[in-house]
Amino acid sequence: MISIESVSNFRDVSIGSKMKKNLLFRCAKLSTLNERDIRVVENLNPHAIIDFRDPKEIEKAPDNLSSKLLDKYINLPISASTLSRMVAQKEIDGDCVKSYEKVMEDSYRMYINNHKEVWTKFFEIMLQSRELQIIFHCYINV
């Protein structure tokens, strides 16, 4: 098991699934990555570090990566304001936001439908990785 202590919710997404272990990792933003954990990530030797944040989010909290890891950094921005727009639209329309789960379900659907080119690129990168790790993240990891 990979232990990254300085980044929120760093985890292997294969846990509990039929995916191969230790290939695909998800976490919150990497701006808090400390020196110890930078070395851990370097030792993983990931094929790619994919950042789904938009430029405004990156500007506020850039990933703390070594030059070795920066070479593997890929930004595939997905608008973080999508969820905010959805909640605001529900309020404007007079709808009641029934539950957190429903809003998240709708936002995930919108993330897919409104950013097909990003997801296409993401899956292309996964196919090219040839058994090397991929780390992906957004701002806060849910």
Enumerate the language-model features and the residues they cover.
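Cys-dependent protein tyrosine phosphatase-like superfamily
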Residues: M1-I135
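A contiguous pocket-lining binding segment that forms or flanks enzyme active sites
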Residues: I134-V142
